Amino acid sequence: MTLLNSYFGDFGGMYVPQILMPALYQLEEEFIFSLKSSKFKIELSNLLENYAGRPTPLTLCRNLTKGTKTKIYLKREDLLHGGAHKTNQVLGQALLAKKMKKKEIIAETGAGQHGVAAAFSCALLNLKCRIYMGLKDINRQQQNVFRMKLMGAEVIPVKTGSGTLKDACNEALRDWSENYINAHYMLGTAAGPHPYPTIVKEFQSIIGKETKRQIVREENCLPNAVIACVGGGSNAIGIFSSFISDNSVSLIGVEPGGKGIHTNKHGAPLTHGETGIFFGMKTKIMQTEEGQIKESWSISAGLDFPAVGPEHAWLYSTKRAQYVSITDHEAVNAFRCLSKSEGIIPALESSHALAYALKLMNNHPQKNQILIVNISGRGDKDIETVKNFLKM
């Protein structure tokens, strides 16, 4: 029996081999204990402030919205150490691993941001680190691969399947099932078997807590909408978490529309998927009529995933959050637009969320609205991808 509720409505659960159940129960127990431990909280808070660089600013776009009555604020997770929101939860998980006396960390990565974060948290806390990464993602994220290796991590190429994030996840789980006694699986998003979605949400909720305080201080009111990209969904659930009970605030998750929903070259399981079992959880997934997992597609490696975290599936089913899609082309346009107008280069993942905010602004230019976009990471890693896309 789990100590915490393992489901969000109908979604979630622990669909893993029996051999992994003791490791998941141990993780849940340590997580609950740590949340009650003032020593753990102080240690994590100290790392977030003095190592990671929290709090991150909430930046008002001064040029992007000229000529309209829209205000767009950017939550600047790109300014964290490591360059993305991943830092928040890897520090928490690394501390949990130390408390459980684990010697090794196993992780998966798509865009490489979680891999980089896992690598530096292991370097900081003296843990061995091995990271599984799809061959396709290795080829498009060479800079992050080198960063991981530079910090002492072993990067293991995954050549099976489509050579992307889902295949890296499968290999990481396989490794963990063989080595769970000495190793902790540092899952990179708010997905997978319980208790991972709950743990990752807890450690990412700092984004939403800060954002709410900051926007009330700046505007003396709540925003009209909070917008975030959704792959597995950790940055989105992190910023959504503080606003879920505020029904006046629209929560908008942006999935990768890839080359267009009509082409099947996309990664939008919430709006164009079915309920199924994948990666240890019951959630919305992209699958064929025969139940086989479809290959997802996105210009953004971090969104190239055929499933989504179970809490997003629940928010979608209850209609508390709205989920939309943005194509590769629209995301690249937003990437260029923010870079040129504000001097901020966003990750391609975050550019999906920004693109939808720009749609809302352009559709209602004279509407007084306050939009918050979570800039989940910086775009240095994506320069070559965008350059090749534009053939510059």
UniProtKB/Swiss-Prot annotation:
**Gene Ontology cellular-component terms listed:** cytoplasm
Specify the domain of life of the species encoding this protein: Bacteria
Keyword line: Amino-acid biosynthesis, Aromatic amino acid biosynthesis, Lyase, Pyridoxal phosphate, Tryptophan biosynthesis
Q: Which PROSITE patterns match?
A: TRP_SYNTHASE_BETA (PS00168)
Q: Which reaction does it catalyse?
A: (1S,2R)-1-C-(indol-3-yl)glycerol 3-phosphate + L-serine = D-glyceraldehyde 3-phosphate + L-tryptophan + H2O
Give all N6-(pyridoxal phosphate)lysine modified positions: 86
Q: Does the keyword Iron-sulfur apply?
A: no
Q: Which InterPro entries match?
A: Trp_synth_b_CS, Trp_synth_beta, Trp_synth_beta/beta-like, TrpB-like_PALP, TrpB-like_PALP_sf
Q: Which family does it belong to?
A: Belongs to the TrpB family.
Q: How does it assemble?
A: Tetramer of two alpha and two beta chains.
Q: Which NCBIfam families does this one have?
A: trpB
Q: What is this protein called?
A: Tryptophan synthase beta chain
Organism in which the protein naturally occurs: Buchnera aphidicola subsp. Melaphis rhois
